[in-house]
Amino acid sequence: MLYYDEINNGNLNLEDPYILEGHHFEEGGPLYEYYGPGDVIDLRTLLADMIQFSDNTAAHVLYQSYGGWTTYRRDALQYASHDVDDHFFEPQNYLTSQYTNDLLVYLYQFQDEYELLLNDMANSFPTEYLNETMPYSTFQKHGNYNIYYSSIGLVLDDNPYAISVLTSLGTRGKIHIGQINQLVNEYIN
């Protein structure tokens, strides 16, 4: 959300170029497959790929360009209403459902400022993860790394809610994410 704020404040433009460097590349996502070191890619593509495909290369470029991991994470705390522990700053991308729900509640409260982000979340695997068994569309950001499959999202239909499902169940976790969202949806509605 930091980059979307910078765009909204006029400090950045979606067309701004970023140079991909060798140390940015991580497996998974389209950037790793279709671009190489030295290629130039615009901010819009980086943001879209990071959200829609959970592209780690795009995320790496963005947090490095923001001032590095620690600066990026420190500034991201502005969206949290709860304290985080020291693990939050470790490079393993440690997250808790409390922190991710804080992000989602903030996003819900300021939806008009994050239309582009919500659009990308709507296009993130619309039939998988939180959306796998849902009667409504969930605006989601998913991720998977080793045995960790996770997804966070907003359901804006009927009775809106935020949901964060973080698993360590391998590929089984991906299936359970959608089932949990469906159960929550049935309970709320």
Identify the role of each PLM range:
Residues 1-9, 64, 102-109, 182-186:
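Short glycine/serine- and small hydrophobic-enriched flexible loop segments
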Residues 1-18, 50, 163:
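Active-site SXXK
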Residues 14-22, 73-77, 113-123:
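Short alpha-helical "patches" and their helix-cap loops
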Residues 15-32, 67:
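Acidic helix-start/capping segments at beta-turn-to-alpha-helix junctions
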Residues 21-23, 50-54, 62-66, 141-144, ...:
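Active-site-proximal beta-strand/loop segments in catalytic clefts of secreted hydrolases
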Residues 123-137:
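Active-site-adjacent substrate-binding region
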